[in-house]
């Protein structure tokens, strides 16, 4: 990787900034580690060089960004002054890029990779947002940082607010990561409850689609994170053998971190599961699968966990799903209801301070996972562009699958 030398950001004019690609040097793993060591000793030039490298979209750019981010996110008494230098350098870069592009929010306005990482979801952007004093600008940056394609965020959403709701994309990133190698549990993509302008639900669409492609589905526990309208719940679906009559049965557990869900929403979920049970019996019959299904068992587990954490329903869904996934990997016979109930009971025994800390640590892990997704995507995009640039074939195809 070749990187531009840009130092003393506060002394650069816009013209000088555009000319900084004249002087370059090669980045190696050894150089990165050396810069990290000297940066931690308080060397300002090393900190600025790490920022230069972090602006890149290859693996060294991501690693340099991770170094800076880790220092900022894990403060100690010895690193407080270094963190101040890192934040100052980040903010200077952002302000220079803002002036150069005349827009702090639209990365496509500039073809220059020097700026793009400062206007898209990245760890550098989270450091910048910490330092920006204006709430209105933090809110504008939040729209970009959270990549709000689903228009979930209100105008007042602040990414740096420790008590905000998690978005669909953040929840999906985290759950996809923890379920990547799970053999006994499958996590489905988070959705809203109702299909817009319809009485149908996304859940029934997903269930019916699965049994039409495989009448024996589900063969493992299925987890569905669902937003009921400003509130996340976790639906667990499992096909079990009823011990009383030795017949198959659909068992559904709805995990809710509040004390109640509401009559209409509960009825909608009951209707969906009962309808799915009928559809499943029909598909099995059509495919000559001669198995009788009992009536489904539907359990609402209202855990009442949000006494101190009013906006943490998304975090609770992630933690609950992680509990089910990890415990079932250890013991595939573990029942989701038992796991979720035990998880909720344990959490309620913690003090308010301990609950805040658990929530904070989870949100930090969730944030890292979300930002890493975009970091990895940027690296892949960078190398794909290099491959296209240096290859001859004119016709290329690519595909993307979200599982």
From Swiss-Prot:
Keywords associated with the record: Hydrolase, Protease, Thiol protease
Record carries keyword Hydrolase: yes
Keyword check for Hydrolase: yes
Effect of residue 313 to S: Abolishes deubiquitinating activity
Pfam families in UniProt: ElaD_SseL-like_N, Peptidase_C48
Gene3D superfamilies the record matches: Adenoviral Proteinase, Chain A
Biological processes, Gene Ontology terms: protein desumoylation; protein deubiquitination; proteolysis
EC number(s) on file: 3.4.22.-
Protein's name according to its UniProt entry: Protease ElaD
GO MF annotation: an example: deSUMOylase activity
Function noted in UniProt: Protease that can act as an efficient and specific deubiquitinating enzyme in vitro. Does not possess desumoylating and deneddylating activities. The physiological substrate is unknown.
SUPFAM superfamilies: Cysteine proteinases
Homology family: Belongs to the peptidase C79 family.
Catalytic residue positions: 231, 313 (nucleophile)
Species: Escherichia coli (strain K12)
């Amino acid at each position: 990787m070749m990187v531009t030398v840009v130092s003393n950001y506060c002394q650069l004019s816009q013209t000088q900034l555009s000319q900084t690609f004249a002087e370059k040097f090669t980045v190696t793993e050894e150089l990165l580690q050396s810069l990290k060591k000297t940066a931690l000793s308080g060397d300002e030039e090393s900190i600025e060089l790490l920022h230069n490298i972090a602006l890149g979209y290859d693996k060294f750019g991501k690693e340099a960004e991770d170094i800076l981010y880790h220092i900022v996110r894990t403060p100690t008494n010895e690193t407080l002054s270094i963190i101040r230098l890192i934040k100052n350098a980040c903010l200077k870069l952002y302000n220079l890029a803002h002036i150069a592009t005349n827009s702090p929010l639209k990365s496509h306005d500039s073809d220059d990779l020097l700026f793009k990482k400062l206007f898209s979801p990245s760890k550098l952007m989270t450091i910048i947002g910490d330092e920006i004093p204006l709430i209105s600008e933090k809110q504008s940056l939040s729209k970009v940082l959270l990549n709000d394609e689903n228009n979930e965020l209100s105008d007042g959403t602040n990414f740096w607010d420790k008590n905000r709701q998690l978005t669909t994309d953040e929840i999906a990133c985290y759950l996809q990561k923890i379920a990547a190698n799970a053999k006994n549990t499958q996590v489905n993509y988070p959705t809203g409850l109702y299909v817009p302008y319809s009485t149908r639900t996304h859940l029934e669409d997903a269930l019916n689609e699965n049994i039409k492609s495989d009448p024996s589905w589900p063969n493992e526990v299925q987890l569905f994170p669902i937003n009921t309208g400003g509130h996340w719940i976790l639906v667990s679906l499992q096909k079990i053998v009823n011990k009383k009559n030795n017949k198959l049965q659909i068992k559904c557990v709805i995990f809710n971190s509040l004390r109640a869900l509401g009559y209409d929403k509960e009825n909608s979920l009951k209707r969906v599961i009962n309808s799915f049970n009928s559809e499943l019996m029909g598909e099995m019959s059509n495919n000559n699968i001669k198995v009788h299904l009992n009536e489904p068992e539907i359990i609402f587990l209202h855990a009442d966990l949000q006494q101190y954490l009013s906006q943490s329903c998304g975090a609770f869904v992630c933690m609950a799903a992680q509990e089910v996934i990890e415990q079932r990997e250890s013991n595939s016979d573990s029942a989701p209801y038992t796991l979720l109930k035990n998880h909720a009971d344990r959490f309620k025994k913690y003090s308010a301070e301990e609950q805040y800390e658990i929530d904070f640590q989870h949100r930090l892990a969730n944030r890292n996972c979300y930002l890493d997704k975009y970091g990895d995507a940027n690296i892949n995009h960078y190398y794909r562009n290099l491959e296209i640039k240096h290859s001859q074939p004119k016709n290329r195809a690519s595909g993307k699958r979200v599982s």
